[in-house]
A protein has these predicted regions:
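C-terminal motif of bacterial Sec signal peptides marking the signal peptidase cleavage site
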Residues: 11-14
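Bacterial signal peptide processing site
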Residues: 16-19
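Post-signal peptide N-terminal segment of mature Sec-exported envelope proteins
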Residues: 23-45
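Contiguous beta-strand segments within globular domains
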Residues: 41-59, 67-68
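Noncatalytic modules at the cell exterior or secretory-pathway interfaces
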Residues: 50-57, 116-133
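Short acidic/polar inter-strand loop motif in beta-rich domains
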Residues: 61-64, 109-112, 119, 130-141
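Exposed low-complexity, polar/acidic, P/S/T/G-rich flexible segments that act as propeptides
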Residues: 72-77, 133-154
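An anionic, turn-rich surface loop/hairpin at beta-sheet edges
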Residues: 87-117
Length: 154
């Protein structure tokens, strides 16, 4: 009987499901600013095509960012080339001018979900446009990134 328990303990760990990892990719923005005519493009990385995921945009900025909000247009492009366009408004500072994101020194980071409960075929590519009214070149942003993580519940 003890031999059966020991054998089961050795075999069962081999049946464990490998954990699905989160992935992130960050793009460093030019020090001269992000031009509104130049979108950023991301190709999300997925570990398991049968799971559903959450996509989150993260932005890092410094004290030279001159606005309270960051307005973005996010195109989520599916495998069949269908485009799901959404507007994203990231509130980077409160009404008193205090930065809302986490960070240290002169850099701050804030992340907001842009898609939840999607399959890999629903989001093959993500294109992000900055749409700040009256602003062709946006200064003070250092990086923009896409974080892909599996949803907790299927």
């Amino acid at each position: 009987m003890t031999m059966i328990i020991v054998a089961a303990m050795l075999i069962l760990p081999g049946c464990e499901h490998k954990p699905v990892m989160s992935h992130a990719r960050f793009v460093h923005l030019p020090s001269m600013g992000w031009l509104s005519s130049l979108p950023l493009s991301f190709e999300p990385e997925y570990d398991d095509s049968t799971r559903v995921y959450e996509l989150t945009l993260a932005v890092r900025h410094d004290n030279s960012f001159a606005y309270r909000n960051l307005s973005l247009v996010v195109d989520v492009i599916a495998a069949d080339s269908t485009i799901n366009r959404r507007s994203v408004n990231m509130v980077l500072a409160d009404e008193f001018g205090n930065w809302t994101g986490g960070g240290f020194g002169a850099l701050y980071q804030l992340a907001v979900p842009v898609a939840k409960g999607i399959t890999p075929s629903q989001a093959r590519r993500i294109v992000v446009w900055q749409t700040m009214a009256g602003c062709d070149t946006l200064h003070g942003l250092t990086t923009l990134g896409l974080v892909v993580k599996p949803c907790d519940k299927q």
